[in-house]
Amino acid sequence: MKMIDDVIIIGIDSGYGNIKTANCCFPASVSTYAKEPVFKENLLVFESKFYLIGEGHKEFLADKTRDLDYYVLALAAIARELNIRKMTCGKIRIAAGLPLTWVSGQRDEFRDYLLQNKAVDFSFRNVSYHVEIVGVDVFPQGFAAVADRLSDFRGVNMICDIGNGTMNIMFINDKKPVSGNMFTEKYGTHQCLLAVRENVMRAHHTAVDETIINRVFRFGTADIKEDYLKTITDTATDYVEGIFQRLREHEYNPELMRLYVLGGGSCLIRNFGVYEASRVTINDDICATAKGYEYLAYVNLLKNGGIV
């Protein structure tokens, strides 16, 4: 997080699989209870309701304002960032984002959603917090992660941000983003996970735990029998081939441009992709986009004379 005067800027990358801030990452899932649950390691209490953060699985919602989940997850993200600085209160400016082609249509609604309470009292992990939400900025995903290094993007560059639910594609040509050449595809890593489950069930007549699948995605292997591993890696390889097919449909040509891959799915490109390494850059910092949101909000405030 960054600070201007007494205002704390906290970047929150509200993904469909994980919530990321500049310093932490946790599952984007919430279970709600009317009474205090037995297990409460990641318990958040807000307006007399109990929320277990990281429990269950959050379904894909193109409209993140449809329920209260992403608001509660934002409170958890704020608490985790404040905890790093040993703080429990403060003025907060949220720097958030949406998929590239959804920003213009959903920005105002998402901003109002995160601003629904100016003063917020809640507790997380048995620590009480009092925060004042003084503003919300909403930026485009993908671009935010590279906004602080545009000078590195000479020539033609394709940016590919692979998240859990979506894949965002844009171009940066001679250090400038091309606003009319941006795309959002519902082809995130969750689609690969579903394909793995289906193929393992078809080939081996058994279910495979998501923990194993994610480990193979991240490291290319896991402590399982070879025939199961082959089914998973073959499926992941097919998924990555699908990514490159979609990139080519959007004019990707490795001979004429460089490719910059980021997001949680970047590990799949590294482990299962076939590409010319000298022309592809993989940024596997899962918090890069949240850091970018903070950077953009900070720069905007400085341009505005520090006025929040």
Question: Locations of the language-model features?
Answer:
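Nucleotide/phosphate-binding catalytic cleft detector across ATP-hydrolyzing
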Residues: 1-159, 176-191, 203, 211-308
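Ser/Thr-glycine-rich phosphate-binding loops at phosphate-binding pockets of nucleotides
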Residues: 162-168
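PRPP/pyrophosphate-binding module of the type I phosphoribosyltransferase fold
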Residues: 169-174
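Acidic, metal/cofactor-coordinating or nucleic-acid-engaging core segments within structured domains
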Residues: 197-203
